[in-house]
Regions:
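Glycine/small-residue-rich hydrophobic helix-like segments
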Residues: 181-252
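Non-catalytic, topology-defining segments of multipass membrane proteins
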Residues: 1-178, 211, 223, 232-291
């Protein structure tokens, strides 16, 4: 009897875990496909229904997109120098490991600074949906939990397993952000930086790194060196002639999806760069960035 109950619980747990991982990957897709490349860097503009869906997904993560975008733009202005708390290079020895665990509280600190200043670029001003719905991030987290309860019931699980899948989703999402901001800025030899604790800069003195593994895990966000060199690029990386769709997707799933959306006329490449804060404003008024 006990063995049967154990097996049943394991099946329920496996279903809840799968739902949570799927939710985390959906969060990654909304983050890289809309909040990062579209909203923040203006690489393209998504069709309204797709953008609306992405906004709803991000709402469920408890994130205010204009705050995230402001923090991220400030990070680009201060990448791996004083004022950028997400840089492993500024964390001392074993900075990659330290930053992995410190990234989330450091982002929260930067976000609170942005919220306090309440200063946003012209293209990041809140609209009616933000004011009425999406700024209410606690409600978004609650709605996300309700969605998990419903998904578990549809999958044949009891509703209470929704709490487990909800936690799994948030853990996956946080893990993705932490690994991007740590290994993504681990310099010329990320693996050596993990093992020896010493981070070596790239030949040009920067610390951005391109990691195939991180890109696979985060749907394309692992190519941080290329991204910092080409922040407005739709695809994070070079696309050699003759490269097939699977190879492109393996390198940058989010960018490949964006390319397909453009071809399907569901996204429009940007022709105007976003209006952003100056480096002085980003550093002095917005505080430290960590995304």
């Amino acid at each position: 009897m006990r063995n049967r109950e154990t097996k049943n619980f394991k099946r329920k747990l496996a279903k809840a875990t799968a739902i949570g991982v799927a939710g985390g990957l959906t969060d990654f897709m909304a983050t890289t496909g809309w909040m990062h490349r579209s909203l923040t860097h203006k690489a393209y503009k998504l069709a309204p229904p797709i953008e609306g869906a992405a906004r709803a997904v991000i709402w469920g993560t408890g994130t205010r997109p204009r705050v995230w975008a402001t923090v991220h733009r400030a990070h680009h202005e201060n990448a791996d120098v004083a004022g950028d708390p997400h840089s492993p290079a500024l964390q001392g020895r074993y900075g990659v490991v330290k930053l992995f665990f410190k990234n989330t509280p450091l982002y929260s600190q930067a976000a609170r600074s942005v919220e306090k200043e309440d200063v946003f670029a012209p293209d990041l001003q809140p609209d009616e949906l933000d004011r009425k719905i999406f700024d209410k991030v606690q409600l978004g987290l609650a709605a996300s939990l309700v969605a998990h309860i419903s998904a578990n019931r549809v999958a044949g699980n009891p509703g209470y397993m929704g709490a487990i899948s909800w936690v799994v989703e948030k853990t996956v999402y946080i893990f993705g952000g932490n690994i991007v901001n740590s290994i993504g800025h681990a310099g010329a030899h990320p693996f050596n930086a993990l093992v020896t604790g010493e981070i070596s800069p790239q030949p040009d003195g920067t610390f951005g790194a391109d990691s195939k593994l991180v890109s696979l895990l985060t749907l394309g966000e692992g190519n941080q060196r290329y991204h910092h060199e080409h922040p407005g690029s739709l695809y994070f990386g070079e696309i050699p002639e003759g490269t097939g769709l699977p190879a492109r997707a393996a390198k940058d799933f989010g960018g490949t999806a964006a390319l397909l959306l453009v071809r399907m006329h569901l996204a429009e490449p940007a022709t105007v760069l976003p209006e952003t804060m100056s480096p002085e404003t980003a550093s002095a008024e917005l505080g430290m960035a960590s995304v």
